[in-house]
């Protein structure tokens, strides 16, 4: 009996009489109170780590001005679109940190619709934003999407791509950004609802609705196919920022028709002069929901993309700047590649102008610049590792306009 009374908890020192029951270990005892305390402390530590992780992201969240400045380092022009995106991104992640509610006011998602011609920087803007915040990023082509049950890519495959890009970490995926390109290609075939199935148009818009607004998407693990007995990974899409982009060719005519009431016919009609002509950018800034509905987007889908950022067409000066100014400018990239072979690469100002003109003629925007540069340097890069004593390669306007070889200068 004496030994029993002297048995005490190794942590708090209380006797067995005080605590009722002790659990014996290899070199001591622990009471129920200390077990509860340990459990509480461990739980608090786990919560603190989660809060610290959230605070870390909070601290990293840049202001709209800082977001805009970062975009300026990689994307030339598009000032209005950058400002719209900076505010939308900031508000979206602030919403996540607040738990979607502030004083019982529920904060809505600020998904973004980018409207602009091919090669104007829509994809680059989305990629740059994701890279800046170090969040997972996935890109999908709307033209490959179909409704579930039809041949093509299921809309939930987009979430799967996002999961793959963060090693299937659900929490990280739920803070990610998804960019859906060519969104203008999934318009319904007519402005009136159809009784026939439109599996790659209105049907896809309907399938994307819930995902963009916010739902719990069930995704098969590690890229497998769905089957009834399978355990699914569940992802809350209400926390994911969706950015959709498209050229929307012909939308400007719909806007112009609405904006310009005067038809220019009849004695009292308002005749438009040259000064009344609006640029594509000016027209897109006046876009209304009704214009997108007339274009073929369903009202419910447009309602899930409240932030619209129009991008302007790139002129010759903008294309020249794209070639030389950004941190990852094309000319800098190729100069770095040649530098690895201890060879200097020079582009004359005239050659830059010629490349910009060529891209404008092809109507491919900034996207076409890489293929132009790659084309003129292909043979040189092919021979480069075998060339001895090569010191410098010069690209002038004749290389672009006449198809001549770049000038080689040897040591």
Swiss-Prot record:
Q: Which residues form the ClpX-type ZB domain?
A: 1-50
GO MF assignments: ATP binding; ATP hydrolysis activity; ATP-dependent protein folding chaperone; protein dimerization activity; unfolded protein binding; zinc ion binding
Write out the residues that bind ATP: 117-124
Q: Which GO terms describe its biological process?
A: cell division; proteolysis involved in protein catabolic process
The entry marks the following residues as binding Zn(2+), namely 9, 12, 31, 34
Q: Which SUPFAM superfamilies match?
A: Glucocorticoid receptor-like (DNA-binding domain), P-loop containing nucleoside triphosphate hydrolases
In which domain of life is the source organism classified?
Answer: Bacteria
Instruction: Provide the transmembrane region boundaries.
Output: none
Instruction: Kindly list the GO CC terms recorded for this protein.
Output: HslUV protease complex
Which InterPro entries does the entry link to? AAA+_ATPase, ATP-dep_Clp_protease_ClpX, ATPase_AAA_core, Clp_ATPase_C, Clp_protease_ATP-bd_su_ClpX, ClpX_bact, P-loop_NTPase, Znf_CppX_C4
State the Pfam families in the record. Answer: AAA_2, ClpB_D2-small, zf-C4_ClpX
Q: Which UniProt keywords apply?
A: ATP-binding, Chaperone, Metal-binding, Nucleotide-binding, Zinc
Question: Its quaternary structure?
Answer: Component of the ClpX-ClpP complex. Forms a hexameric ring that, in the presence of ATP, binds to fourteen ClpP subunits assembled into a disk-like structure with a central cavity, resembling the structure of eukaryotic proteasomes.
Output the PANTHER family linked to this UniProt entry.
ATP-DEPENDENT CLP PROTEASE ATP-BINDING SUBUNIT CLPX-LIKE, MITOCHONDRIAL, ATP-DEPENDENT CLP PROTEASE ATP-BINDING SUBUNIT CLPX-LIKE, MITOCHONDRIAL-RELATED
The UniProt similarity line reads: Belongs to the ClpX chaperone family.
Function per UniProt: ATP-dependent specificity component of the Clp protease. It directs the protease to specific substrates. Can perform chaperone functions in the absence of ClpP.
Q: What is this protein called?
A: ATP-dependent Clp protease ATP-binding subunit ClpX
Its source organism is Actinobacillus succinogenes (strain ATCC 55618 / DSM 22257 / CCUG 43843 / 130Z)
Q: What is the lineage of its organism?
A: Bacteria, Pseudomonadati, Pseudomonadota, Gammaproteobacteria, Pasteurellales
Name the gene: clpX
């Amino acid at each position: 009996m004496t030994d029993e009374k002297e048995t005490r908890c190794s942590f708090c020192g209380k006797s067995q009489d005080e605590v009722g029951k002790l659990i014996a270990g290899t070199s001591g005892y622990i009471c129920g109170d200390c077990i509860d305390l340990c459990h509480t402390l461990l739980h608090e530590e786990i919560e603190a780590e989660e809060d610290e992780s959230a605070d870390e992201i909070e601290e990293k969240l840049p202001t709209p001005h800082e977001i805009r400045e970062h975009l300026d380092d990689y994307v030339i022009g598009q000032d209005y679109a950058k400002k719209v995106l900076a505010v939308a991104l900031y508000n979206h992640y602030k919403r996540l940190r607040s738990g979607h509610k502030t004083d019982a006011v529920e904060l809505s998602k600020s998904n973004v619709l980018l409207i602009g011609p091919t090669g104007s920087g829509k994809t680059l803007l989305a990629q740059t934003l994701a890279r800046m915040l170090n969040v997972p990023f996935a890109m999908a082509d709307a033209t490959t999407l179909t409704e579930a049950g039809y041949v093509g890519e299921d809309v939930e495959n987009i979430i799967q791509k996002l999961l793959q890009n963060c090693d299937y970490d659900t929490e990280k995926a739920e803070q990610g950004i998804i960019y859906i390109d060519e969104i203008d290609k999934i318009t319904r075939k007519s402005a009136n609802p159809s009784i026939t199935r439109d599996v790659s148009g209105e049907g896809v818009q309907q399938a994307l609705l819930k995902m963009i607004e916010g739902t719990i998407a069930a995704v098969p693990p590690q890229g497998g196919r769905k089957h009834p007995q399978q355990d699914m990974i569940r992802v809350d899409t209400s926390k994911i920022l969706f950015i959709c982009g498209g050229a929307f060719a012909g939308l400007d005519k719909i806007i112009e028709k609405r904006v310009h009431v005067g038809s220019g016919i009849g004695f009292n009609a308002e005749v438009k002069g040259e000064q009344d002509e609006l640029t594509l950018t000016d027209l897109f800034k006046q876009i209304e929901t009704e214009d997108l509905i007339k274009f073929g987007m369903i009202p419910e889908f447009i309602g899930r993309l409240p932030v619209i950022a129009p991008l302007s067409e790139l002129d010759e000066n903008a294309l020249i700047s794209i070639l030389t100014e950004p941190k990852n400018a094309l000319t800098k990239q190729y100069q770095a590649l040649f530098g690895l072979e201890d060879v200097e690469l020079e582009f004359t100002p005239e050659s830059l102008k010629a490349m910009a003109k060529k891209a404008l003629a092809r109507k491919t925007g900034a996207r076409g610049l890489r293929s132009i540069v790659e084309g003129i340097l292909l043979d040189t890069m092919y021979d480069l590792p075998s060339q001895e004593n090569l010191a410098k390669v010069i690209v002038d306007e004749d290389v672009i306009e006449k198809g001549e070889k770049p000038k080689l200068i040897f040591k």
